[in-house]
Regions:
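C-terminal motif of bacterial Sec signal peptides marking the signal peptidase cleavage site
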Residues: 16-19
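A sequence/structural signal for flexible, mid-protein segments enriched
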Residues: 21-419
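Bacterial N-terminal signal peptides that target proteins for export
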Residues: 1-8
Length: 419
């Protein structure tokens, strides 16, 4: 459901049923904006979600969450599931498995700002398992001849929808990868301290030793991280009007060595969701529009209507979709190693004298100035070694800290349970 908003927030508005997309000028005042409602029910027991927001104007790409709306999911048997407003514009309700069976149908009802909005009913259609996930190594030639080519992996899936299965699908992907910092910790700057023995101020720099067990743990403490994130792309497919419902080699997404994702270990969790014909048209045109325009930020405003309408004002434009989807998931992991393309750890402060001045924050040897002027510690320094592989204490430099602290690239030090 968050994926829907990620694309709508870019101002992409398309027609759903027309194969030819025509420019559209909305029949709303510049100050009125429009309402966005997204919701979904899956066959997985647990919380089902909806999201409600409004823009301040038609051309505004900032969405303002709407709270304190009355939101309900109603199934075909008349069961009502009231959604709680648990976060800004976010609503949820818990549904047990007994209410999430194949063939059940659901609608979303929203009462907000004195108006009632309802979706069409959408049904849970049967979903086959994902049979396999695999990849092929590829090379991508750049459009700019001055750039180097990239290598990467093209992922594919197979599934068999022969029999009583849905015809329309979309896929979501969550990727996780392990990566290392470019360097381990060897030198730690902890500020300025007063040495009572020598009666003078000194830099507090700790040099770690590989022969000390605790130091070795410190060296590796910020070296290895993991990142998990959603893949921000749309993938849809339909077997409508196709005799063979067995699908092999369906391409999904590409990951390249432009980042650090393929340096150690990479895992992808793919979620396969069934779609009704209305939901498929909605997602498929979002996918087409984003591909044709080189990204959704480059699109012009079009109208994208889903299956939600205002009962009190049929002329009101309501953006978004409520859908019901059966879900199957499968994880694939590979330990393929591809060197990261063109990455360099630059010095922030190079040269011993410059580094001393930077770390001291004032005249060397004198009491340090206001602590607010000192660099934040700890800082991890870059060492240099001589021909005998001995540390040269007069040649430290300060490099980008993300080259030593892997968490500064967005990762966590906690290994995933499935790793």
């Amino acid at each position: 459901m968050q994926a829907i908003r990620a694309y709508l927030v870019l101002g992409v508005l398309l027609p759903v049923l027309n194969a030819c997309i025509e420019p559209f000028t909305p029949n709303i005042g510049e100050s009125e904006g429009y309402l966005v409602i997204n919701g979904t029910v899956t066959d997985e027991e647990g919380y089902q979600f909806a999201e409600i927001s409004r823009t301040s104007s038609y051309s505004d790409r900032v969405y303002f969450p709407l709270n304190e709306c009355e939101v309900k999911v109603i199934d075909g048997q008349g069961n009502i599931f009231i959604m709680e407003n648990y976060d800004n514009g976010q609503y949820r309700t818990w549904m047990d498995k007994q209410y999430l069976q194949k063939g059940n149908r659901y609608m979303l009802q929203v009462i907000c700002d004195g108006k009632t909005y309802e979706s069409e009913y959408d049904s849970l259609l049967p979903c086959p398992d994902i049979d396999s996930i695999y990849y092929k190594e590829i090379s991508i030639e750049p459009d700019d001849p001055t750039e180097t080519s990239k290598t990467g992996l093209q992922f594919y899936i197979d599934y068999d929808a022969t029999g009583d299965y849905a015809e329309n699908y979309r896929w979501e992907a969550v990727e996780t990868w392990e990566y290392n910092a470019e360097e381990r910790i060897f030198l730690i700057y902890n500020g300025i301290k007063f040495d009572e023995h020598d009666s003078m101020y000194k830099l507090d720099i700790r040099i770690l030793s590989i022969f000390n067990e605790n130091d070795r743990k410190t060296m590796d403490s910020l070296y290895t991280c993991w990142i998990t994130r959603e893949v921000k792309s749309i993938y849809t497919y339909t077997s409508h009007q196709k005799i063979d419902k067995k699908v092999s080699g369906l391409p999904l997404y590409v990951v390249t060595n432009k980042s650090n994702r393929l340096t150690i270990k990479y895992s992808i969790l793919i979620k396969q969701l069934t779609l009704s014909s209305t939901a498929f048209n909605y997602w498929n045109q979002l996918q087409t529009q984003s591909q044709e325009n080189g990204g959704l930020y480059e699109t012009q405003p079009y109208q994208l209507k889903g299956n939600i309408k205002c009962l009190d004002d049929e002329e009101e434009n309501v953006i978004g979709l409520f859908s019901a989807s059966s879900v199957r998931t499968k994880r694939f992991t590979t330990s393929i190693h591809m060197n990261r393309q063109n990455y360099y750890c630059a010095d922030i402060v190079e040269g011993w004298n410059r580094l001393l001045t930077y770390l001291w924050g004032g005249e060397i040897g004198q009491p340090p100035p206001n602590e607010d002027l000192l660099p934040v510690s700890p800082l991890y320094l870059h060492p240099f070694f001589d021909e005998m592989n001995s540390l040269r204490p007069d040649t430290f430099s300060l490099i980008n800290q993300s080259c030593i602290d892997c968490t500064l690239k967005g990762g966590t030090l906690t290994k995933p349970d499935y790793w």
